[in-house]
Amino acid sequence: MGLIVISRGIDLSEVAIMAGAWSVALIEMQNGVPILGGVLIALAIAIVIGVVNGVMVAFVEAPALFVTLAAGFVIYGLAFWFAPAWVVYAPKDVPRLTFLGAGHVFGVPMPIIVFLLAAVAMHLFLSRTSTGRFIYSQGDNPEAARMAGIALRPLIVLEYVIVALVAWLAGLVWIGTTGSMQMAITQGTMVFDVILVVVLGGISLVGGRGGVFSVVVGCALIGTLLNAFTIMDVNSEVQNIIRGVVLLAAIILDNWLHPRDEETARQGD
């Protein structure tokens, strides 16, 4: 999500991509498809959805907010039609997946290692490649980036594919940790937690600012908040109120710190 926001976009379908792609893949594994085949099925589904989202935003020029919101509902409906269960379990005896979610290397849990490796890879991509610099240019001033010769439409498609790949990787770790995929998460607050991670981490909603370190900070803050909810036994209704207030406050603060001038706002809309 952070990458999309840096580019002045948004993707509300990320959680649905994770749950939908892996629910279908787990059903196929239960039907006899090898583990590697199931992993590739989930990967293919995620990539296709990312391409469709990107094409709708870049070439059809539909608003990203509504495209990805609609995509989330479509993914949920199709996945639940194909795998009509709130919880789809992974086949038994899959040590590689189990190790990925519950294993340790030198005492460090594998999910943390996967997260750090993905964060480093994304940091290098954004900071050391021309494509990464183009993404920042797009978020800072789309019209100037276009006049500089940057092909924004293919770049936007690539951004949504990358987000889908991150969702696929998150699902892989999720299954390794829990041994299942829960379609119910598409109807919960996880998508708002993802947005909170981005906003609280300091990635500007007007685009062009922030980075991987911002996402790491946001993850730490949200992790602390969720742990506090658990320790204090805060009920779900109050949790949602707090989430909403924190998100609104963070958006107002971001808008105050990074105001969009009239010309830039017009170019990005």
Question: Where are the model-predicted features located?
Answer:
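Membrane-interface helix caps of multi-pass small-molecule transporters
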Residues: 3, 27, 31, 51-59, ...
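Hydrophobic core segments of alpha-helical transmembrane domains in multi-pass membrane transport
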Residues: 1-2, 43, 72-79, 114-124, ...
